Each structure stands twice: as C-alpha cells, then as structure tokens.
Amino acid sequence: RVERALSTAGVDLRVSTAVETVRRGTLGVEVKAVGGEYEAFDDVIFATHSDITLALLGDGNSIECEALEAIKYQPNEMILHGDTSIMPKRKAAWASWVYTEDKERQSDRIDLTYWINRLQSLPNDDPCFVTLNTQRDIDPALIYDQCTFHHPVFDVAALKAQKVLTDLNGANSTWFCGAWMRNGFHEDGLATGIE
C-alpha cells in the first residue's frame, strides 16, 4: 500500500539498492549505487546508523565527520525465545523490561529481557521474549532466533553530536535521522525522520 502511494506520487522507490557513496554540490546531491553511475537528487536523507552515514558521505565536512564519529556503537547479542525461566520467579514482578545482574557476570553489558507479549499486546498463552547479552541458560528448544544488534552508546559526546547534527539538518541538501538521533527507540527513528 505504501509503495503504491509513493509510486502514485511520482516517487522512484528503489528497494534493496546498496549505496556506495554520496557527494553534494551546488546543484544538490549525487548518489552512486554499487555498480551504478552517479545520479542527481535535490536532497539526501541519511536514515542509517551514524557510522554507516559517515562511510557513505564521501565529502563530509569536518563538523559532520566529527559529530558522526562521536556516536559509538556496542554489539548486543539478542535471543528471541519463549523460555519463562529467564523471567522473575514471581509473575507479579514481570514487567515490559526486566534487568538482571548476576554477581558473577563476565561482561560489561547488561542482561535485559523485553516481554514482547506486553510490549506488542500479544496473548500471554504463548510467551515471547527478547533477551540481550545473557549469560544465563535459555532452553534451546524455545529459542526462535538469535542475532547481534549494534546499539548506539549515549554518552556525553553522543548527546553533543546529536545537537550538532540536528542543527545541520537541511544544510548542504543533507538530512540526518534515525533512532540514534534521540534515545535509540524505533519511535525516535520515525520522529526524527518526520522532523
């Protein structure tokens, strides 16, 4: 439905098109897809992680580059599962987000479980959880998926960089958006895209 609406509005939507580099000039922006030629556009909207944006921005100025480099990422190991043993023993203590810390943990990253049923209003008879960075055992029969996410680290440098990049939005036909431009939530990505 969205693709049809964009097509009706004259939008040339290109999905799964890897971009090699972006350069800006007095007449707008040129984007070069992998294996393609440069194509001209009025503006560019970077809706990618800041490190990917930096890699794509072939002619970034020092202010843009310093701000984009200031936002660091950390890997978080994700397990999508249905193992209720990972949650507190008392069901009354279950919450949308459950933080656990083992005195003997071997990592500097937090062990956090999202209760997907509560967050997505799913029926509770089929428990679904996303657990990050756990060193606890999860029943392998109840693991549905595993992957590594790269989440932004919101330190002082990152917060300053967010402000710099927000102030730069629109300059040089360039726009920056994404969850990393606020608090890291999907809704933040949408909000910064709309802004």
What kind of feature is each model-predicted range?
Residues A18-P152:
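Mid-domain catalytic core of redox enzymes
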Residues V2-E3, V31-A33, D188:
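Structured catalytic cores of enzymes that bind and process phosphorylated ligands/cofactors
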Residues R1-V2, L56:
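Hydrophobic side chains in well-ordered alpha-helices of soluble proteins
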Residues G10, F41-D42, A171-N172:
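Short, well-ordered alpha-helix to beta-strand connector turns
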Residues A161-K163:
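Polybasic (Lys/Arg-rich)
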Residues L6-E20:
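A conserved beta-strand/loop element that lines the FAD pocket in flavoprotein oxidoreductases
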Residues L165-G184, G189-I194:
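Short FAD-binding loop at a beta-strand-to-alpha-helix junction that anchors the flavin cofactor
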